[in-house]
Amino acid sequence: LVGSEMCIRDRGMFLINRNGGTALTSAFAAVPKTKKQGGHNQLQILVTERENYIASCQPKAKLPWRIIVVARNDKELADNDMVYKLAAPSRMKDISWIRPGKVAWEWWNHWGIKGVDFEAGINNETYMHYIDFASRHGIEYVILDEGWAVNLKADLFQIVPEIDLKKLTAYARQKNVGLILWAGYHAFARDMEHVCKHYSEMGIKGFKIDFMDRDDQEMVDFHYRAAEIAAKYKLMVDFHGTYKPTGLNRTYPNVINYEAVHGLEQMKWSDIHTDQVTYDVTMPFIRMLAGPVDYTQGAMHNANKRCYHSSMDTPMSQGTRCRQLAEYVVFESPLNMLCDSPTNYDREEECTEFIATIPTVWEQTIAMNGEIGKYITMARRKGDVWYVGSLTNWDARTLTLDLSFLGAGRWKAEMFHDGVNANRLASDYQKTVTDIPASRKLTVKMAQGGGCALKIYKE
Protein backbone atom coordinates (compact mmCIF):
# COMPACT_ATOMS: atom_id res chain seq x y z
CA LEU A 1 0.00 0.00 0.00
CA VAL A 2 1.15 3.53 -0.80
CA GLY A 3 -0.76 6.68 0.12
CA SER A 4 -0.65 9.80 -2.02
CA GLU A 5 -2.72 12.73 -3.25
CA MET A 6 -3.26 15.15 -6.11
CA CYS A 7 -5.20 18.30 -7.07
CA ILE A 8 -4.27 20.04 -3.82
CA ARG A 9 -4.80 23.60 -5.09
CA ASP A 10 -5.80 26.07 -2.35
CA ARG A 11 -5.08 23.85 0.61
CA GLY A 12 -2.07 22.46 2.41
CA MET A 13 -0.71 19.07 1.61
CA PHE A 14 -1.14 16.23 4.05
CA LEU A 15 1.54 13.90 5.33
CA ILE A 16 1.16 10.32 6.47
CA ASN A 17 3.16 9.36 9.53
CA ARG A 18 3.60 5.92 10.99
CA ASN A 19 2.23 5.85 14.51
CA GLY A 20 3.38 2.44 15.64
CA GLY A 21 2.33 -0.84 14.11
CA THR A 22 0.03 -0.35 11.14
CA ALA A 23 -1.62 2.84 12.39
CA LEU A 24 -1.44 5.91 10.15
CA THR A 25 -2.21 9.51 11.02
CA SER A 26 -2.39 12.62 8.88
CA ALA A 27 -0.95 16.05 9.55
CA PHE A 28 -1.67 19.33 7.79
CA ALA A 29 0.40 22.51 7.64
CA ALA A 30 -1.64 25.43 8.93
CA VAL A 31 -1.93 28.70 7.02
CA PRO A 32 0.95 31.12 7.73
CA LYS A 33 0.04 34.06 9.99
CA THR A 34 3.34 35.93 10.26
CA LYS A 35 6.50 35.53 8.18
CA LYS A 36 9.98 36.94 7.73
CA GLN A 37 12.68 36.79 5.10
CA GLY A 38 15.59 34.50 5.99
CA GLY A 39 16.90 31.02 5.47
CA HIS A 40 19.62 30.08 3.02
CA ASN A 41 21.21 33.29 1.69
CA GLN A 42 18.04 35.22 2.52
CA LEU A 43 16.25 33.35 -0.28
CA GLN A 44 13.28 32.11 1.72
CA ILE A 45 10.23 33.39 3.53
CA LEU A 46 10.12 31.68 6.91
CA VAL A 47 6.89 31.19 8.83
CA THR A 48 7.14 32.54 12.37
CA GLU A 49 3.53 31.92 13.41
CA ARG A 50 0.61 29.96 11.94
CA GLU A 51 -3.16 30.28 12.04
CA ASN A 52 -5.34 27.64 13.68
CA TYR A 53 -6.78 26.51 10.32
CA ILE A 54 -5.27 24.73 7.34
CA ALA A 55 -6.97 26.48 4.41
CA SER A 56 -9.08 29.43 3.39
CA CYS A 57 -11.35 28.55 0.48
CA GLN A 58 -14.79 28.98 -1.03
CA PRO A 59 -17.70 26.90 0.39
CA LYS A 60 -18.09 24.87 -2.81
CA ALA A 61 -14.39 24.36 -3.44
CA LYS A 62 -13.39 20.93 -4.70
CA LEU A 63 -11.45 18.78 -2.29
CA PRO A 64 -8.17 17.10 -3.25
CA TRP A 65 -7.91 13.43 -4.14
CA ARG A 66 -6.52 11.28 -1.33
CA ILE A 67 -5.63 7.82 -2.56
CA ILE A 68 -4.36 4.48 -1.40
CA VAL A 69 -2.60 2.49 -4.12
CA VAL A 70 -2.98 -1.26 -3.68
CA ALA A 71 -0.52 -3.54 -5.48
CA ARG A 72 -0.24 -7.31 -5.72
CA ASN A 73 3.53 -7.09 -5.42
CA ASP A 74 6.24 -4.49 -4.98
CA LYS A 75 7.13 -4.12 -8.64
CA GLU A 76 3.63 -2.91 -9.54
CA LEU A 77 4.23 0.18 -7.42
CA ALA A 78 7.22 1.13 -9.57
CA ASP A 79 5.03 1.51 -12.66
CA ASN A 80 1.90 3.15 -11.31
CA ASP A 81 0.63 6.47 -12.68
CA MET A 82 -2.57 6.90 -10.69
CA VAL A 83 -1.49 10.32 -9.40
CA TYR A 84 -1.03 11.57 -12.95
CA LYS A 85 -4.29 10.06 -14.19
CA LEU A 86 -6.39 11.60 -11.42
CA ALA A 87 -4.81 15.04 -11.73
CA ALA A 88 -6.61 17.90 -13.43
CA PRO A 89 -6.16 17.81 -17.24
CA SER A 90 -3.77 20.13 -19.00
CA ARG A 91 -4.66 23.80 -19.08
CA MET A 92 -2.12 24.46 -21.82
CA LYS A 93 -3.27 24.56 -25.44
CA ASP A 94 0.22 24.43 -26.95
CA ILE A 95 2.88 22.17 -25.49
CA SER A 96 4.91 21.73 -28.68
CA TRP A 97 7.66 23.99 -27.33
CA ILE A 98 8.31 21.84 -24.24
CA ARG A 99 11.53 19.96 -24.85
CA PRO A 100 12.55 17.29 -22.32
CA GLY A 101 16.20 16.33 -22.23
CA LYS A 102 19.41 16.14 -20.28
CA VAL A 103 21.27 18.91 -18.50
CA ALA A 104 24.96 19.53 -17.88
CA TRP A 105 25.03 20.65 -14.24
CA GLU A 106 27.90 22.48 -12.58
CA TRP A 107 26.95 22.86 -8.92
CA TRP A 108 27.38 19.23 -7.81
CA ASN A 109 30.90 18.99 -9.24
CA HIS A 110 31.75 22.47 -7.93
CA TRP A 111 32.68 23.82 -11.36
CA GLY A 112 35.35 21.10 -11.29
CA ILE A 113 37.05 21.41 -14.66
CA LYS A 114 40.79 21.03 -15.26
CA GLY A 115 43.25 21.54 -18.09
CA VAL A 116 41.86 24.90 -19.17
CA ASP A 117 43.47 28.33 -19.44
CA PHE A 118 40.96 30.16 -17.24
CA GLU A 119 39.95 30.02 -13.59
CA ALA A 120 36.92 27.78 -13.28
CA GLY A 121 33.97 29.21 -11.42
CA ILE A 122 30.96 31.42 -11.94
CA ASN A 123 32.07 33.24 -15.07
CA ASN A 124 31.47 33.30 -18.82
CA GLU A 125 34.46 31.13 -19.69
CA THR A 126 33.36 28.30 -17.41
CA TYR A 127 29.80 28.23 -18.71
CA MET A 128 30.97 28.38 -22.31
CA HIS A 129 33.07 25.31 -21.50
CA TYR A 130 29.98 23.50 -20.16
CA ILE A 131 28.03 24.60 -23.24
CA ASP A 132 30.75 23.19 -25.51
CA PHE A 133 30.65 19.91 -23.61
CA ALA A 134 26.86 19.70 -23.87
CA SER A 135 26.95 20.47 -27.58
CA ARG A 136 29.55 17.77 -28.30
CA HIS A 137 27.41 15.11 -26.65
CA GLY A 138 23.96 16.20 -27.79
CA ILE A 139 22.96 17.30 -24.29
CA GLU A 140 20.04 19.68 -24.58
CA TYR A 141 20.69 22.08 -21.69
CA VAL A 142 23.19 23.69 -19.36
CA ILE A 143 22.03 25.02 -16.02
CA LEU A 144 23.39 28.08 -14.24
CA ASP A 145 22.84 27.10 -10.63
CA GLU A 146 23.13 29.31 -7.57
CA GLY A 147 25.64 32.14 -7.93
CA TRP A 148 24.78 33.86 -11.22
CA ALA A 149 22.64 36.42 -9.37
CA VAL A 150 24.13 38.63 -6.65
CA ASN A 151 24.17 36.87 -3.28
CA LEU A 152 21.86 37.90 -0.42
CA LYS A 153 19.77 40.24 -2.60
CA ALA A 154 16.93 37.88 -3.60
CA ASP A 155 16.81 39.83 -6.85
CA LEU A 156 17.02 37.99 -10.18
CA PHE A 157 17.79 41.19 -12.05
CA GLN A 158 21.06 41.78 -10.19
CA ILE A 159 23.56 39.61 -12.06
CA VAL A 160 27.16 39.17 -10.91
CA PRO A 161 29.63 41.09 -13.13
CA GLU A 162 31.44 37.90 -14.18
CA ILE A 163 28.32 36.69 -16.02
CA ASP A 164 26.95 38.13 -19.28
CA LEU A 165 23.69 36.25 -19.73
CA LYS A 166 22.91 37.72 -23.14
CA LYS A 167 26.31 36.62 -24.40
CA LEU A 168 25.95 33.14 -22.92
CA THR A 169 22.44 32.72 -24.29
CA ALA A 170 23.57 33.69 -27.78
CA TYR A 171 26.58 31.37 -27.55
CA ALA A 172 24.41 28.48 -26.36
CA ARG A 173 21.92 29.08 -29.17
CA GLN A 174 24.72 28.76 -31.74
CA LYS A 175 25.62 25.42 -30.16
CA ASN A 176 21.99 24.19 -30.09
CA VAL A 177 22.01 24.19 -26.29
CA GLY A 178 19.40 25.83 -24.06
CA LEU A 179 20.09 27.58 -20.76
CA ILE A 180 18.15 27.04 -17.53
CA LEU A 181 18.49 29.40 -14.56
CA TRP A 182 18.40 28.50 -10.88
CA ALA A 183 16.26 30.75 -8.69
CA GLY A 184 15.51 30.95 -5.00
CA TYR A 185 11.74 30.90 -4.71
CA HIS A 186 11.40 34.26 -2.89
CA ALA A 187 13.38 36.07 -5.58
CA PHE A 188 11.22 34.41 -8.23
CA ALA A 189 7.95 35.05 -6.39
CA ARG A 190 8.58 38.76 -5.80
CA ASP A 191 7.85 39.60 -9.44
CA MET A 192 7.46 36.35 -11.35
CA GLU A 193 5.60 37.95 -14.25
CA HIS A 194 8.45 40.38 -14.91
CA VAL A 195 11.09 37.70 -14.32
CA CYS A 196 9.49 35.24 -16.73
CA LYS A 197 8.84 37.84 -19.42
CA HIS A 198 12.36 39.26 -19.25
CA TYR A 199 14.26 35.99 -19.34
CA SER A 200 11.98 34.36 -21.87
CA GLU A 201 12.64 37.25 -24.24
CA MET A 202 16.36 36.77 -23.64
CA GLY A 203 16.08 33.13 -24.74
CA ILE A 204 16.25 31.33 -21.39
CA LYS A 205 14.40 27.98 -21.54
CA GLY A 206 13.36 27.46 -17.95
CA PHE A 207 13.87 27.92 -14.22
CA LYS A 208 14.97 25.56 -11.48
CA ILE A 209 13.13 27.04 -8.49
CA ASP A 210 14.49 26.11 -5.07
CA PHE A 211 14.14 26.39 -1.29
CA MET A 212 10.36 26.43 -0.97
CA ASP A 213 10.67 23.97 1.94
CA ARG A 214 7.00 24.28 2.88
CA ASP A 215 3.75 22.60 1.90
CA ASP A 216 1.11 24.90 3.38
CA GLN A 217 -1.72 26.44 1.36
CA GLU A 218 0.27 29.54 0.50
CA MET A 219 3.19 27.55 -0.85
CA VAL A 220 1.00 25.14 -2.80
CA ASP A 221 -0.60 28.17 -4.45
CA PHE A 222 2.87 29.50 -5.33
CA HIS A 223 3.61 26.32 -7.28
CA TYR A 224 0.44 26.73 -9.34
CA ARG A 225 1.09 30.40 -10.04
CA ALA A 226 4.72 29.76 -10.96
CA ALA A 227 3.69 26.99 -13.36
CA GLU A 228 0.96 29.12 -14.94
CA ILE A 229 3.04 32.24 -15.49
CA ALA A 230 6.07 30.26 -16.67
CA ALA A 231 3.82 28.50 -19.20
CA LYS A 232 2.56 31.87 -20.43
CA TYR A 233 6.13 32.76 -21.40
CA LYS A 234 7.06 29.29 -22.65
CA LEU A 235 9.39 28.46 -19.79
CA MET A 236 9.87 25.04 -18.22
CA VAL A 237 9.97 24.66 -14.44
CA ASP A 238 11.99 22.23 -12.32
CA PHE A 239 10.85 22.48 -8.69
CA HIS A 240 13.58 21.80 -6.12
CA GLY A 241 13.37 21.99 -2.35
CA THR A 242 9.69 21.15 -2.60
CA TYR A 243 7.05 18.61 -1.64
CA LYS A 244 6.36 15.51 -3.72
CA PRO A 245 4.53 15.79 -7.07
CA THR A 246 0.75 15.90 -6.86
CA GLY A 247 -0.20 15.97 -10.54
CA LEU A 248 0.72 19.56 -11.36
CA ASN A 249 2.91 18.21 -14.16
CA ARG A 250 -0.26 17.04 -15.92
CA THR A 251 -2.16 20.28 -15.39
CA TYR A 252 0.87 22.31 -16.50
CA PRO A 253 3.15 20.04 -18.56
CA ASN A 254 5.87 22.71 -18.50
CA VAL A 255 6.48 21.51 -14.92
CA ILE A 256 9.11 19.18 -16.23
CA ASN A 257 10.53 17.75 -13.00
CA TYR A 258 10.55 17.73 -9.21
CA GLU A 259 13.31 17.10 -6.71
CA ALA A 260 11.49 16.12 -3.49
CA VAL A 261 13.99 13.31 -3.04
CA HIS A 262 17.12 12.44 -1.07
CA GLY A 263 19.14 12.70 -4.25
CA LEU A 264 22.80 12.48 -5.13
CA GLU A 265 23.47 16.05 -4.00
CA GLN A 266 23.22 14.68 -0.45
CA MET A 267 26.50 12.86 -1.02
CA LYS A 268 28.34 16.18 -0.89
CA TRP A 269 27.75 16.43 2.86
CA SER A 270 26.27 13.15 4.15
CA ASP A 271 28.37 11.12 6.59
CA ILE A 272 29.35 7.47 6.25
CA HIS A 273 26.23 6.34 8.10
CA THR A 274 23.97 7.57 5.29
CA ASP A 275 22.79 4.57 3.28
CA GLN A 276 22.04 6.04 -0.12
CA VAL A 277 22.28 2.64 -1.81
CA THR A 278 19.34 1.17 0.11
CA TYR A 279 17.41 4.38 -0.43
CA ASP A 280 17.91 4.02 -4.19
CA VAL A 281 16.08 0.69 -4.19
CA THR A 282 13.32 1.98 -1.91
CA MET A 283 12.45 5.34 -3.45
CA PRO A 284 11.27 4.04 -6.87
CA PHE A 285 8.47 2.05 -5.21
CA ILE A 286 7.21 4.94 -3.07
CA ARG A 287 8.32 8.47 -3.97
CA MET A 288 8.43 7.82 -7.72
CA LEU A 289 4.81 6.70 -7.66
CA ALA A 290 3.91 10.36 -7.13
CA GLY A 291 5.74 11.55 -10.24
CA PRO A 292 9.10 12.31 -11.84
CA VAL A 293 12.22 12.73 -9.77
CA ASP A 294 15.22 15.01 -10.28
CA TYR A 295 17.70 12.74 -8.50
CA THR A 296 20.74 14.27 -10.28
CA GLN A 297 22.74 11.09 -10.95
CA GLY A 298 25.76 10.56 -13.18
CA ALA A 299 28.77 10.50 -10.83
CA MET A 300 32.02 9.23 -12.31
CA HIS A 301 33.74 9.06 -8.90
CA ASN A 302 32.22 6.02 -7.20
CA ALA A 303 32.85 4.44 -3.81
CA ASN A 304 31.97 1.34 -1.82
CA LYS A 305 31.01 1.44 1.85
CA ARG A 306 34.59 1.46 3.06
CA CYS A 307 35.83 4.20 0.73
CA TYR A 308 32.90 6.61 0.70
CA HIS A 309 33.26 10.00 2.35
CA SER A 310 31.54 13.31 1.83
CA SER A 311 33.19 16.12 -0.10
CA MET A 312 31.76 19.45 -1.20
CA ASP A 313 34.40 20.00 -3.89
CA THR A 314 35.09 16.48 -5.20
CA PRO A 315 31.94 14.50 -4.38
CA MET A 316 31.36 10.83 -5.07
CA SER A 317 28.46 8.40 -5.22
CA GLN A 318 27.83 5.37 -3.05
CA GLY A 319 27.83 2.17 -5.09
CA THR A 320 29.26 1.28 -8.45
CA ARG A 321 29.71 3.08 -11.74
CA CYS A 322 27.13 0.88 -13.44
CA ARG A 323 24.67 1.84 -10.73
CA GLN A 324 24.95 5.43 -11.89
CA LEU A 325 24.28 4.44 -15.50
CA ALA A 326 21.32 2.24 -14.57
CA GLU A 327 19.69 5.04 -12.60
CA TYR A 328 19.09 6.93 -15.85
CA VAL A 329 16.75 4.09 -16.79
CA VAL A 330 15.27 3.17 -13.41
CA PHE A 331 14.38 6.71 -12.34
CA GLU A 332 11.68 8.60 -14.25
CA SER A 333 13.12 12.03 -15.01
CA PRO A 334 12.09 14.07 -18.08
CA LEU A 335 14.77 16.67 -17.28
CA ASN A 336 17.76 14.58 -16.29
CA MET A 337 20.99 15.99 -14.89
CA LEU A 338 24.55 14.95 -15.63
CA CYS A 339 25.97 15.85 -12.26
CA ASP A 340 29.68 15.44 -12.90
CA SER A 341 32.17 17.74 -14.62
CA PRO A 342 33.14 17.79 -18.30
CA THR A 343 36.66 16.84 -17.20
CA ASN A 344 35.47 13.65 -15.53
CA TYR A 345 33.08 12.79 -18.35
CA ASP A 346 35.72 13.32 -21.02
CA ARG A 347 37.98 10.94 -19.11
CA GLU A 348 35.17 8.35 -19.10
CA GLU A 349 34.09 8.68 -22.71
CA GLU A 350 32.48 5.24 -22.97
CA CYS A 351 30.13 5.84 -20.05
CA THR A 352 29.43 9.40 -21.13
CA GLU A 353 28.41 8.38 -24.63
CA PHE A 354 26.07 5.76 -23.20
CA ILE A 355 24.41 8.26 -20.85
CA ALA A 356 24.03 10.72 -23.71
CA THR A 357 22.03 8.18 -25.75
CA ILE A 358 19.47 7.45 -23.02
CA PRO A 359 16.12 9.19 -23.64
CA THR A 360 14.37 11.10 -20.86
CA VAL A 361 10.79 10.38 -21.97
CA TRP A 362 9.42 7.00 -22.95
CA GLU A 363 6.71 5.29 -24.98
CA GLN A 364 6.48 2.15 -22.85
CA THR A 365 7.61 1.16 -19.37
CA ILE A 366 7.73 -2.28 -17.76
CA ALA A 367 8.58 -2.92 -14.12
CA MET A 368 10.38 -6.23 -14.58
CA ASN A 369 11.14 -7.18 -11.00
CA GLY A 370 11.80 -5.69 -7.62
CA GLU A 371 11.52 -5.85 -3.87
CA ILE A 372 11.44 -2.74 -1.74
CA GLY A 373 14.82 -2.04 -0.18
CA LYS A 374 16.52 -4.87 -2.05
CA TYR A 375 16.54 -4.57 -5.84
CA ILE A 376 14.67 -3.28 -8.88
CA THR A 377 14.73 -3.68 -12.67
CA MET A 378 12.93 -1.34 -15.07
CA ALA A 379 12.65 -1.62 -18.86
CA ARG A 380 11.73 1.42 -20.94
CA ARG A 381 11.22 1.80 -24.68
CA LYS A 382 11.69 4.75 -27.02
CA GLY A 383 10.97 3.92 -30.65
CA ASP A 384 12.42 0.51 -31.44
CA VAL A 385 15.11 0.64 -28.75
CA TRP A 386 14.75 -0.73 -25.23
CA TYR A 387 16.77 0.32 -22.20
CA VAL A 388 16.93 -1.84 -19.09
CA GLY A 389 18.32 -0.79 -15.72
CA SER A 390 18.85 -2.91 -12.60
CA LEU A 391 19.92 -1.81 -9.11
CA THR A 392 20.69 -3.81 -5.99
CA ASN A 393 21.25 -2.87 -2.37
CA TRP A 394 24.54 -3.61 -0.59
CA ASP A 395 24.06 -7.31 -1.33
CA ALA A 396 25.69 -8.66 -4.47
CA ARG A 397 22.94 -10.15 -6.58
CA THR A 398 22.35 -12.28 -9.69
CA LEU A 399 19.12 -11.76 -11.61
CA THR A 400 17.69 -13.57 -14.60
CA LEU A 401 15.87 -11.05 -16.75
CA ASP A 402 12.84 -12.14 -18.76
CA LEU A 403 13.03 -10.19 -22.03
CA SER A 404 10.09 -11.89 -23.71
CA PHE A 405 8.51 -8.48 -24.31
CA LEU A 406 11.02 -7.95 -27.13
CA GLY A 407 9.03 -10.08 -29.52
CA ALA A 408 10.29 -11.79 -32.67
CA GLY A 409 13.54 -11.08 -34.45
CA ARG A 410 17.20 -10.99 -33.57
CA TRP A 411 18.21 -8.55 -30.87
CA LYS A 412 21.53 -7.34 -29.52
CA ALA A 413 22.29 -5.83 -26.13
CA GLU A 414 24.96 -3.27 -25.34
CA MET A 415 25.55 -4.05 -21.70
CA PHE A 416 27.36 -2.17 -18.92
CA HIS A 417 27.85 -4.41 -15.90
CA ASP A 418 29.91 -4.35 -12.73
CA GLY A 419 33.51 -5.44 -13.17
CA VAL A 420 35.00 -8.39 -11.30
CA ASN A 421 36.68 -5.98 -8.88
CA ALA A 422 33.72 -3.66 -8.38
CA ASN A 423 33.18 -4.77 -4.77
CA ARG A 424 36.57 -3.24 -3.99
CA LEU A 425 36.87 -0.59 -6.71
CA ALA A 426 33.38 0.73 -7.33
CA SER A 427 34.28 2.37 -10.64
CA ASP A 428 35.26 -0.98 -12.19
CA TYR A 429 32.92 -2.01 -14.99
CA GLN A 430 32.79 -3.98 -18.21
CA LYS A 431 31.04 -3.20 -21.45
CA THR A 432 29.97 -6.13 -23.60
CA VAL A 433 27.82 -6.58 -26.68
CA THR A 434 25.84 -9.79 -26.71
CA ASP A 435 23.06 -11.47 -28.68
CA ILE A 436 19.77 -11.83 -26.85
CA PRO A 437 19.15 -15.60 -26.76
CA ALA A 438 16.05 -17.15 -28.28
CA SER A 439 14.90 -18.04 -24.77
CA ARG A 440 14.77 -14.28 -24.07
CA LYS A 441 16.45 -14.94 -20.74
CA LEU A 442 19.54 -12.95 -19.78
CA THR A 443 21.49 -13.26 -16.53
CA VAL A 444 23.03 -10.18 -14.94
CA LYS A 445 25.37 -10.08 -11.97
CA MET A 446 25.62 -7.04 -9.74
CA ALA A 447 28.28 -6.23 -7.17
CA GLN A 448 27.56 -4.86 -3.71
CA GLY A 449 25.76 -1.57 -4.28
CA GLY A 450 25.86 -2.41 -7.96
CA GLY A 451 23.84 -2.02 -11.08
CA CYS A 452 23.52 -3.01 -14.71
CA ALA A 453 22.41 -0.99 -17.73
CA LEU A 454 21.44 -2.35 -21.15
CA LYS A 455 20.59 -0.85 -24.50
CA ILE A 456 18.72 -3.42 -26.61
CA TYR A 457 18.15 -3.02 -30.32
CA LYS A 458 17.26 -5.12 -33.36
CA GLU A 459 20.02 -6.33 -35.63
Report each predicted region and the residues it spans.
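C-terminal beta-strand-rich structural cap/linker in extracellular carbohydrate-active enzymes
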Residues: 433-459
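Aromatic- and carboxylate-enriched substrate-binding clefts and catalytic-loop regions
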Residues: 145-320
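N-terminal accessory beta-strand-rich subdomains and adjacent acidic, glycine-rich linkers
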Residues: 4-87
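Conserved, mostly hydrophobic/aromatic
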Residues: 134, 210, 237, 330, ...
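Glycan-recognition and catalytic regions of carbohydrate-active enzymes
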Residues: 340-387, 423-427
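Carbohydrate-binding surface patches
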Residues: 371-411, 452-453
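Solvent-exposed beta-strand/loop surfaces of large extracellular or lumenal domains
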Residues: 415-439
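An acidic-aromatic substrate-binding cleft motif
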Residues: 59-141
